Amino acid sequence: MESIGIVAPQTMHFAEPLRLQSGSVIGNYQLVVETYGELNAARSNAVLVCHALNASHHVAGVYADDPRSTGWWDNMVGPGKPLDTNRFFVIGVNNLGSCFGSTGPMSADPSTGKPYGASFPVVTVEDWVHAQARVADAFGIERFAAVMGGSLGGMQALAWSLMYPERVAHCIDIASTPKLSAQNIAFNEVARSAILSDPDFHGGDYYAHGVKPKRGLRVARMIGHITYLSDDDMAEKFGRALRRADGALDAYNFSFDVEFEVESYLRYQGDKFADYFDANTYLLITRALDYFDPAKAFDGNLTAALAHTQAKYLIASFSTDWRFAPARSREIVKALLDNKRTVSYAEIDAPHGHDAFLLDDARYHNLIRAYYERIANEVGA
């Protein structure tokens, strides 16, 4: 299947202030957006793809000045791909608080002319959805054919179906959860603590010091990567292999330098992440993850929380995902069925853990392709 090819982002400016769930107000903000495919005359073939923690608006294609800049879900979105851009108009939005061009901690605070830094207000999944709704309004899209996402993106898709039930025909929620477990909140807290305790953090105002809390970001990313992979996948990829060709005991360095392949992998991922991601953004997004809990306002009753939804749903999970285990997806399915909603559920047998939602797995992609075929028939795409 061909790639969507060269793409370019666009920046959308919004003058109307956005009141956040915290009570803070963001005024005169911008969101970076990419679109793929063509919006039909009826504006009925639009699909919103919501991104996860470290991703962005750049869902598919490449940038002209960097042929290596492949979109984070390029295997899913494009001509002839499961989400076929020959049939659908796909929108990717970089969320508020991110570090890829939308208004966030790195942006200039109009009141000071300096980066917001630690003063940027805490944002939630619900805040992102309200901001995304303004993007839809700007395109003249009254109703999405589908809102889709994996992991944190799946939480946004679910929130869309709750907050704007009349604007979502289908909700595709992959490798996600209705709320974080205590264990998941704990992982996020350890990652945040690594950043907050980095001497280069400077209370979140490190921009003025010309430094970046890279040590903390590295550790945060390493923690994340451990949770994204399954034990079996890590065993197959790395096992106990040493970086030295000779795996015998006498090949040990007897030091604390990198010796095992898994150590090398984690440090590589940590270094790469620390080079391109912003620490304040990491704090904001992980806290948004922690706060997401639509059932909280209903005394923990997810069935009651989903009572006013109108969409049809595809919920998908992966057998070896222990970060957001299949049981968490089944909680959503049960609550939807209790409300007599139309819901399809698939638990895909895949060895790759949580990261499976990003990978090119034939059974997974066939599932998504078949579901979008159904949507295409409904909207005449």
From Swiss-Prot:
**Where on this chain does substrate bind?**
221, 355
Catalytic residues per the record? 151 (nucleophile), 321, 354
Which catalytic reaction applies to this protein? L-homoserine + succinyl-CoA = O-succinyl-L-homoserine + CoA
Assembly and partners? Homodimer.
Q: What is its main location?
A: cytoplasm
Transferase: present as a keyword of the record? yes
Name it.
Homoserine O-succinyltransferase
Cite the AB hydrolase-1 domain residue spans from the record.
45-360
- What's a single GO MF annotation on this record? homoserine O-succinyltransferase activity
Keywords, sorted A to Z: Acyltransferase, Amino-acid biosynthesis, Cytoplasm, Methionine biosynthesis, Transferase
**Role:** Transfers a succinyl group from succinyl-CoA to L-homoserine, forming succinyl-L-homoserine.
Tell me the compartments it is located in: Cytoplasm
Q: What is the lineage of its organism?
A: Bacteria, Pseudomonadati, Pseudomonadota, Betaproteobacteria, Burkholderiales
Question: What Pfam families does the annotation carry?
Answer: Abhydrolase_1
Q: In which pathway does it act?
A: Amino-acid biosynthesis; L-methionine biosynthesis via de novo pathway; O-succinyl-L-homoserine from L-homoserine: step 1/1
- The protein's gene is named metXS
